[in-house]
């Protein structure tokens, strides 16, 4: 693999640079869907879980035993399941959306395409950035990245990034008389980049994500003539993947 001009790549690719991402990447990967054509990211019940569709191709079931049709890569590392697909990456250098099968370059589970998140590398110079967000529904987000000066004769650079997402529950449960869907995510990453020679580069990154968010709220409703309602369009829970609602004659 090597970097190429996107105009020379014989494939359908959308690429977003850091400037674009800072304006659109508010909380997680769902924000990318609005700036890339043919891409739909549908959040599912589990925290950080999503069913991703490119050109209408997706895997409806997001159980860990199933492989997604659209793959998620972060820094070249494949994320094997739909769980935690909604990355909360803050210091992304760019995000690439490749449409169509990508088995030649990326291997299996890329029938529909893939989303590749490439984070920025340690710069070796002291500096950083911070982003503070306050919004309705008690949303309070803090994101920060710090680069440290290089050591070992300038060959070893390090970087630390941290994210704290809190609040943002906009569902009201009338029965419980409380807000539902509150977000509570704490994550950080430590990255070290070692360049012992001009021809050798070694990067090691440690990530830790603690997601204590509420389970995503869903609506239960019925059609005329139905006794029970199921989660919105997730009838597969009762073995009925083609129809919404649990039909019963009474």
Q: How should each PLM-predicted stretch be described?
A:
Residues 2-4, 59, 135-137, 165-169, ...:
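Structural signature of outer-membrane beta-barrel domains
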Residues 53-57, 171-172, 215-216:
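Short secondary-structure transition/capping segments
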Residues 1-125:
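Acidic, small-polar-rich N-terminal luminal/periplasmic segments of exported/outer-membrane proteins
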Residues 177, 182-250:
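Outer-membrane beta-barrel domain signature, strongest for Gram-negative TonB-dependent receptors
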Residues 43-45, 162, 204-206:
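Glycine-rich, histidine-containing beta strand-loop boundary motifs that form or position
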Residues 74-76, 148-150, 192-195:
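Residue-level signature of outer-membrane beta-barrel architecture
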Residues 50, 67-69, 81, 90-99, ...:
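Outer-membrane beta-barrel translocator/receptor signature
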């Amino acid at each position: 693999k090597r970097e190429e001009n996107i105009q020379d790549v014989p494939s359908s690719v959308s690429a977003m640079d850091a400037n674009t991402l800072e304006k659109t990447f508010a909380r997680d990967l769902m924000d990318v869907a609005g700036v890339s054509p043919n891409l739909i990211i549908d959040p599912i019940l589990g925290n950080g879980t999503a069913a991703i569709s490119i050109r209408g191709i997706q895997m409806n079931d997001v159980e860990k035993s199933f492989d997604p049709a659209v793959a998620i890569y972060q820094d070249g590392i494949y994320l094997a399941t739909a769980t935690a697909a909604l990355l909360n990456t803050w210091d992304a250098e760019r995000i690439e959306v490749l449409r169509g099968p990508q088995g030649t370059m990326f291997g299996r589970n890329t029938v529909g395409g893939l989303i590749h998140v490439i984070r920025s590398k340690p710069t070796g110079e002291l500096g950083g950035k911070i982003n503070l967000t306050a919004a309705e529904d008690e949303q309070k987000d803090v994101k920060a990245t710090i680069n440290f000066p290089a050591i070992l004769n300038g060959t070893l650079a390090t970087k630390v990034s941290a994210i704290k997402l809190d609040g943002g529950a906009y569902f009201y449960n009338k029965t419980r008389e409380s807000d539902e869907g509150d977000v509570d995510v704490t994550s950080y990453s430590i990255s070290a980049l070692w360049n012992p020679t001009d021809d050798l580069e070694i990067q090691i990154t440690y990530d830790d994500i603690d997601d204590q968010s509420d389970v995503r709220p869903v609506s239960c409703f019925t059609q005329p003539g139905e006794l029970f309602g199921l989660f919105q369009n997730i009838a597969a829970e009762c073995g009925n993947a083609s129809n919404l609602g649990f039909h019963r004659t009474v």
